[in-house]
Every structure is written in C-alpha cells, then in structure tokens.
Amino acid sequence: MISISIRNDISCLIYFSKPIRSILQDYNSGIEIVGDYRISKKWYIAAELGNEEFTTNEDFTNSTSKGSYLKAGVNYNSYNNWLDMNNEIFIGFRYGFATFEQTLNSYQINTGNTILPPVFNNSPSTQKGLTAHWSELQLGFRAEVYNNIFITFSGSYKVMVNISDPRNFKTHYAPGFNRIYNSNTGFGFNYTISYLIPFAKK
C-alpha cells in the first residue's frame, strides 16, 4: 500500500500490508494508494484508491471478483500531539464505490439425492460492469515507533448501500468492501508499517 500524506510538510508514506498479504494468500492480490490532506488542526480529507482480486470458495461454488475501488471522506484526529509529533487517534467516514467483474469459476448442483452423484460445472462464466456503493466508519491509531517509521491499526464498520449482482448468481465479494453477507454489513481490520519520506517543507 502506498500513501501520500500532506500535513505540515509535503511527505510520502509507504505502507506494506497489502503486498505482504498478497504474497501470503494466493487467493488474494491487490494494491492500494492512500492519501490525506490536513484542512485544519484536527480534520483531514482522506481517500483510498485500489485494485483487488479475490477468490471466494463456498460449499457449492468457487468465484473470483476483480476490479477497482475508490473511498473518499474525512478523518478527525482526537489526539493532541506534543511539539512536532505526528501521532493520531482518529475516527473517519468514507463513501465507497467499486466497479468490478465477477467470474463463476465452478459450481456444484445440489440434487438433494444421496444415490445420484453430484453434478459439477467447471466452465467459467464472467459478467463485467458490476458496481457497488457503501458507507464506512473507521476507527484507528497511528504511532511513530522509530524515526519516520509508523505503525497503524484501524478497524471499520461497513454498510452496503447498493450492489449489482451477476445473472443467476449472488456477489460474494466486492473490491474495497470485502465479503458480502445477507445483512449487507461487514467489518474490516487493517494494519500497516509505514515509512515517512519528507519531500519539502511548506
């Protein structure tokens, strides 16, 4: 994950969570660019732009979602820093939008008959042009653990507003939102190790 951050100076933050997760999980790959801009002492404009591919394996289906997403909103930093510290305890709100395609890789027809063998279909079927809209509440903290090295932990609660499903199949995963359940709500957790690269003072 790569982040551009503008506060008291122009700087760049590089996050390492998504590339590492892509290496450890062969069913998940993606990249995310995150930026924020301070508009007052406590308030930041924030956005995340990413691309993700995720394969979901259910009892009778295997499907892959692939696409891009944008999340935009604000962060409020409730922490009072001393001197030139840049730590944060923040709460944030995001509006999220994703455009993606979903491929039904394979599925098993459940006949409900224990005598007949199960019926499998391994012919992939892809539908493009799917979209998703959601809102997101974030809570987290960012702390400088060494000179220009930060660690961030955050959690999010997401509510799906609208999503388009493929014909004759339900979307199980939307890029940027994660897994989709019957309640159309979900939780997310993010952790990052970042390095701050200052470019120039204002």
Feature names for model-found ranges:
Residues I23-S78, L83:
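Glycine- and aromatic-enriched membrane insertion/assembly motifs of diderm outer-membrane
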